[in-house]
């Protein structure tokens, strides 16, 4: 059974601010989760052009996070089978990620994201069919809330109480009850997650586990977007691209893959039209 769920994450940012925040948080959280044995290896990061998405940046990454897998899954899957590969096409305000696992060749997870300057009440922003809408679940995530489930523990939990936090640089916060309907600026990340694990006996259980993991990741990363606002506020996309380039090199060096570190990042000037990749 294919799971389809749309997560709506309302943020107290403008669309322009959120783009910077997300880039910064992804970079920092990848650094925090990468050690000499596990973490994120960046295979490639380069410009792309696509008829549907326009221009953006394509990235290919390998996630070696075997220790974060549920115990029940590790009982019948080897550590190498739990390595996953992500391809992502970021043409902000539209993004798409496709995640596959070589150890489970039929498994596929896609995350389609559309960002809008609203407070989470837009319907069917992804243009789903009637059949897809009937199967889709919708959940609005409140970043001022906290979670204590298994996946929140695995992903990590911020100790910052956003109901009390106030940004020193912007004066924003705290996020009190009803903040999503009152704050300005405001925007929403509409994340449509589709998971298909067509394996008899454990496929449904793994689909549910992965969806719970995605929810925990969305909550924690977006809580960090606001909790770390004084770190990223004022940065430009050009500054962030340079920081990303340095971070990607550092990640690959941490994992002992200097060759990947040297070749992973390609600038627009270095990218030929023939080498650009379209969205899958």
Tell me what each language-model feature is.
Residues 1-280:
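Eukaryotic helix-grip
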């Amino acid at each position: 059974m294919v799971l389809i769920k749309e997560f709506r994450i309302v943020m107290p940012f403008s669309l322009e601010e959120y783009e910077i925040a997300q880039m910064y948080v992804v970079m920092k959280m990848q650094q925090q989760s990468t050690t000499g044995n596990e973490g994120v290896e960046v295979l490639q990061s380069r410009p792309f052009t696509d008829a549907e998405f326009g221009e953006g940046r394509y990235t290919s990454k390998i996630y070696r996070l075997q220790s974060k897998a549920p115990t029940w899954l590790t009982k019948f899957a080897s550590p190498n089978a739990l390595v996953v590969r992500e391809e992502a096409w970021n043409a902000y305000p539209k993004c798409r990620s496709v995640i596959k696992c070589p150890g489970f060749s039929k498994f596929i997870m896609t995350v389609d994201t559309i960002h809008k300057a609203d407070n989470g009440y837009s319907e069917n922003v992804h243009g789903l069919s009637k059949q897809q809408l009937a199967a889709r679940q919708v959940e609005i995530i409140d970043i001022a809330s906290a979670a204590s489930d298994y996946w929140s523990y695995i992903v990590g939990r911020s100790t910052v109480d956003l109901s009390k936090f106030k940004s020193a640089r912007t004066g924003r916060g705290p996020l009190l009850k009803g903040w999503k309907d009152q704050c300005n600026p405001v925007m929403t990340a509409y994340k449509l997650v589709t998971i298909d694990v067509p394996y008899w006996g454990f496929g449904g259980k793994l689909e549910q586990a992965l969806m719970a993991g995605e929810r925990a990741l969305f909550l924690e990363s977006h809580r960090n977007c606001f909790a770390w606002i004084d770190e990223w506020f004022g940065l430009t996309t050009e500054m962030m691209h340079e920081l990303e380039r340095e971070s990607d090199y550092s990640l690959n060096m941490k994992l002992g893959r200097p060759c990947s570190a040297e070749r992973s990042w390609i600038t627009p000037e270095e990218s030929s039209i023939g080498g650009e990749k379209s969205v899958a």
